[in-house]
Each structure stands twice: as structure tokens, then as C-alpha cells.
């Protein structure tokens, strides 16, 4: 039967190596204020997801054209469906130039605020946590929910 494995933290890939770097602290503080993040772990999760995307793009770039062909298009389509890129036919070099803002812009909290359903980014977070926001008719209470492109226009308020 064996013992259970201890679950790994998903944000460790995005956690900075030197957390007391002044420039990094100021940048993180600015991003937390702009996107209404509650703690740095939410920012580190976004960085970890971005790191996964760029690592995958770099590995695809290192392959030969024959090896890359069947893997490249599904990867680009997935990024397009999630809304991280604007066009599924972009070059892999453009995917490597993504930054953490591309991930943070797809969070439900940010989209609710940008749609004008909330007065501020913090108000958007409160509406979501209190269960006043539905995505495609289903109540979502996680402000960090990454909204796919197809569900973006199906966000509504529940009274």
C-alpha cells in the first residue's frame, strides 16, 4: 500500500531566490496593488504558471522542425483558449516574451473589475468571495480562477 506523498507547493517555481531584493519587493508590491492580490503567494503562483509556459516554449524551440510540428499547435491553441496570447499562430519567440501581467489579467477578479461589474479591484474580490459572481451560470468563489476566453462573456452577477 505505501505511504502518501507529501503534496508539493505549487508556487515554489515562481518564488524568488532572494526575497529581500529591494527592486523585486517594490515590483511585487506594485503588482499586488494593481491586481488586488491578497498575498505574495498568489503572485508566485502566477509566476510559476508563466515559468511552466516559457519552459515548455523553450523546449519546443530546441526540437527539430519534425519533432516540434505535432506538439507546437496544441500548445499554442491551449494558450489562446486561456487568453494568454492574442493569436494561435504566433511565433514561439512571442510566447517567451510573455510576462506575469498576462497571467494576472486572466484572473476572475481582474476580469470582473475590467468589465465594470465592480467599483474597484478590491470590490471585485469581495463580490467573488461572497458568492455574488457566476461564470456560465455556476457560482465561483475563487478570485484566482483563470477565466478561459470562451467563458469571458458569460460572467454575471448573482443577486
From Swiss-Prot:
Family: Belongs to the universal ribosomal protein uS4 family.
Species this chain originates from: Pyrobaculum aerophilum (strain ATCC 51768 / DSM 7523 / JCM 9630 / CIP 104966 / NBRC 100827 / IM2)
UniProt-recorded Gene Ontology molecular function terms: rRNA binding; structural constituent of ribosome
The keyword ATP-binding belongs to this UniProt entry's keyword annotation: no
Keywords: Ribonucleoprotein, Ribosomal protein, RNA-binding, rRNA-binding
GO biological process terms held by the UniProt record: ribosomal small subunit biogenesis; translation
Matching HAMAP family: Ribosomal_uS4_A
Role: One of the primary rRNA binding proteins, it binds directly to 16S rRNA where it nucleates assembly of the body of the 30S subunit.
Protein name: Small ribosomal subunit protein uS4
Assembly information from the UniProt record: Part of the 30S ribosomal subunit. Contacts protein S5. The interaction surface between S4 and S5 is involved in control of translational fidelity.
Disulphide linkage map: none
Domain named S4 RNA-binding: residues: 106-158
GO cellular component, one term: small ribosomal subunit
InterPro entries reported for this sequence: Ribosomal_uS4, Ribosomal_uS4_arc, Ribosomal_uS4_CS, Ribosomal_uS4_euk/arc, Ribosomal_uS4_N, S4_RNA-bd, S4_RNA-bd_sf
PROSITE patterns: RIBOSOMAL_S4, S4
